[in-house]
Amino acid sequence: MSKAGVTEGNESQIKFLESLTAFTKEHRARHWEGTFAAFLEDVLPRDTQRLTRNSHQYVWDMLRRSGAKEVGAQDQMSSYQLFADELFGIDDALERVSDYFKAASAGSEVGRRLLLLLGPPSGGKSTMVILLKRGLEEYSHTEEGALYAIKGCPIKESPLHLIPHTLRGTFRETYGVEISGELCPYCRVRLEQEFAGDFMKFPVHRIFISEAGREGIGTYAPHDPATADIADLVGSVDLSKVSKYGDEGDPRAWSWSGAVYAASRGVLEMIEILKVKREFLYLLLTLTQEKNVKVSRFPLIYLDETILAHTNLAEFHKFLQEKENEALLDRMVIVRVPYTLSYKEEARIYTKLISAAPHFRETHLDPHALRVAAVFAILTRLHKSEREGLDLSKKVRLYAHEEVEGISSSEVDRIRAETPEEGMSGVSPRFVINALSKAITRSEARSLTSMEVLLALKDAIESDARMEAKQKRQWLDFLVVVRKDFYNHWVKEDVHKALFASFEQEAQTLLEKYLDEVEAMLDHREIVDPITGETRPPDERFLRSVEEKIHISESGKLSFRQEVVRKAMVAYKQGTKFSLDSHARLHEAIEQYLFEERRDVLRLVTSSKRPDEEAKQKISAVQRRMVEEYGYDEHSAKEALNYVTTLLSQE
C-alpha cells in the first residue's frame, strides 16, 4: 500500500476516534446519588414537572425532543427524526402512534389502553418499537430525560413513593404536582428493616434506561402455550432465598426478574401478543388500566409503564373469531401499520436494506432497478378501484404524488379511504430483497439491470411453493404492467436525453413557447413575431400536438391550459421561474413531443446493423453520457440502449 493510502487510513481512524470521544462527551450524563432528603433539597426543585412524569409523558417528551416537522398548531407533528432514516412511507401509522402518546400524556383515557401495532410481516412494526426503545435509552442520558429511582428497588420506582399519603396533599401544595403510586413491597420491607421507617435516609440515584441492563425496557416473546409460565412476566418465589428470610411471602425472597418489572418507568414490548394465554392478556390489560399487578402473597404492586404490543393479521383475525375476546379489544388502541403504497418510499426501503449487504455494495444497480421492483411490490398491495378510468397503474402514480389526468391531488385521501385494506397484504420488502440477492449471485458482470430485476422477480414468483396458481398469474401480469407502463417510459427518456445533449434547454424553450401560445389564446390576442414584427393568431395545431401526447381531450384542453397558466402565475408571484418541474404532466407532454420529433434520428443511430464511424461515435457518446450523467455503468447503459432499440423497432 502506498504512503498516501496509509495516511488516508490513519486519518479516517483518527477521525473515527475523535467522533467517539465527541459522542461520549455529548451523551455523558451527570450521575447522582444521595439520600431522599438530598433529592428533595437538591434535585427535585430544579425541574419538578419533568421529574414527576409518568411513562407516557416521558415517551411523548422523548418524541418531541427527537425533532419533527411542524404542520400546524403547536405539538402537531408530521414526521419525527427518530424514524426518519429507518421507516419510509408509513407516516400515517407514525402519526397515530404519536397521537396516542400525546393523548395519553395529557391524562386522557387513551393512556389506560394497551397500544397494539397491527400489520403484515416486514411492515415496520418491530422496527418502530426498536427505535422507540433506542430513543428512550438515549433520552435518559440527557439532562432533560433524567430519571431518578430508589436505589436497590427491583422495579426502579420513583423516590416520591416514599412520601406517606398523609403528606401528599402538602407536597401537592408545595410543588404543584400529584404523586401517583405506592411503595413496592420490597422497598416497604427495606424501609422498616434497614431504616427503621426513616424514609428521608433512603438512598436515591439517577438511572439510565437500558434494554440490555433490563432497566426501563422489558421484552416478552411468546412460548409454546403448553409450557408458557406467567412467572416470565411477574416473577416467582426464589427458593434459594426462602431459607434466608424464612417466609415465601417475604418480598426479598421473591424473584423480581419478570418482564413487567424490567419495564417499570419505561416500556414493555409484547412480541406477537395475541399468541399468549388469555390469563396473560388479562394481567397486561389490568396493568394498563389500573397500573397494578397482583401476585400471590403480596398486595397490589404499582407499576408505571407503557405496553407496546405488535401482532400480524393472521393472529388478529383468529383472535377476532373468539367472542370472549371482544371485551379485550375494547381495552386496546389498535394502530394499523401497513406496507407503504408509494413506490418511491418503497425504493428507499430497498436502498436501506441493501446498503448493509456487502454483495450489494459491490454490485452496480441501474437507476431504475429498485424502482421497477418497488412498483411491482405496490401493485401487489393495491385493490382495484370502482372508479371509472382509475386503473392500478394510475393508482401507483397517485400514491407516489404524481399527477394523473382527471384526478386532483385532493382526491387521493378519498380514494385511499375507499379501500382501507390496501397495504395490509402483498409482497414484503424481504421477498424483493431475497429475489435481488439471488439475481446478484447469478450475475457475472457485477451489474444488475432493471430487466434482470424483473426476471429475478419472475423466478421468485414461479418458484414460491406457498403461492396459489391464481395469485402467481396475477403477479406475473403485474411484472408486464411494470415494464410497459413504467420502465419503458423511464428508459426511453434516459436514452433520449443522452442522445440529445441540449435536451434540457430545448425542452425549456418549448415550454416557454407553449406558455406564450396558451396565454395569447386565453387572452384572445395575437402574437407578434420577434423577427418580422408581424402578428399571427396562436398556434392551435402546436398546442394540440403537445397536449395529445398526454391524452388531453378536445373538451378538456381549456381547463388544462387554465391550470398551466394558473401555476405559472403562482410561480411568478413567488419570484420563481416556471420550469419543467413546475408541472409534471406538461413536463411529460413536452418530453414526448421532443421524443417524437427525434424518433427517426434515434432509430437511425441505434438500429443500424453495420453502423458507420459517425454512428459508432454517437452510440459511444450516448453510452458515455448515460454513465456520467444518468447513473448507469457500461453494462447497464449498453443493455438499456439495446432495449430501446428493440422498442423502437416494434413501434
Question: Which functions belong to the PLM regions below?
Answer:
Residues 5-55:
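Long, basic/Gly/Ser/Thr-rich N-terminal segments
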Residues 40-651:
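Conserved ASCE/P-loop NTPase catalytic core
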Residues 1-3:
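Bacterial/eukaryotic Sec-type N-terminal signal peptides
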